[in-house]
A protein has these predicted regions:
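Phosphodiester-processing cores and adjacent nucleic acid-binding clamps
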Residues: 1-166
Length: 166
């Protein structure tokens, strides 16, 4: 996202950023610090300009369906998805991974639309990976390890979004 986001979009896209070594860790910490001081818009955010400036020794994964590439795919914008994939590949090279997820839930309290979206996104992501010779990783959208931690996670989300716990 650019620093000048629309008034309606404060969320940004999800992206996994990992440090390869101490230098990568320093770059990651620098970006996180700047996201709070310069990129804050409803929440701390890191834009592509910061990624370009501090990209050395970082590993990037395209993230869950909340990521830029899956969102473009789900919105029917394969052209934008491919443009984004190429931007990340050009900047991060072999340290850029396309991510797929597929975890169907039988929990009646969970969002039931996530799995079909993952299936749709995965198909297009695999096509982009083949076309541009990008490695694919299979992950899960894990936010806590133990089921009993779900309530604490819900409370944390409510605190960060300013919503009430149901």
């Amino acid at each position: 996202h650019s620093k000048l986001a629309s008034q309606n979009d404060r969320s940004g896209w999800h992206l996994i950023v990992l440090a390869k070594n101490l230098n990568g860790y320093k770059n990651l910490i620098k970006m996180v610090s700047l996201s709070w001081t310069e990129g804050f818009y409803g929440r701390p955010r890191i834009d592509k300009e910061l990624l370009e400036k501090y990209h050395e020794d970082l590993i990037i994964c395209s993230a869950c369906i909340g990521g830029e590439i899956p969102q473009h795919i789900l919105n029917g914008r394969m052209d934008k998805a491919e443009e984004s994939v190429l931007w990340f590949k050009n900047l991060f090279g072999e340290d850029y991974y396309l991510e797929i997820q597929r975890h169907e839930t039988h929990d009646p309290n969970a969002a039931q639309d996530v799995y079909p979206h993952q299936v749709t996104a995965n198909k297009a992501i695999l096509e982009l990976a083949r076309k541009h010779n990008i490695k694919v990783i299979a992950t899960n959208d894990v936010h806590f390890v133990n089921a009993e931690d779900a309530e604490a996670h819900d409370r944390l989300i409510c605190l960060s979004t300013g919503k009430d716990l149901d």
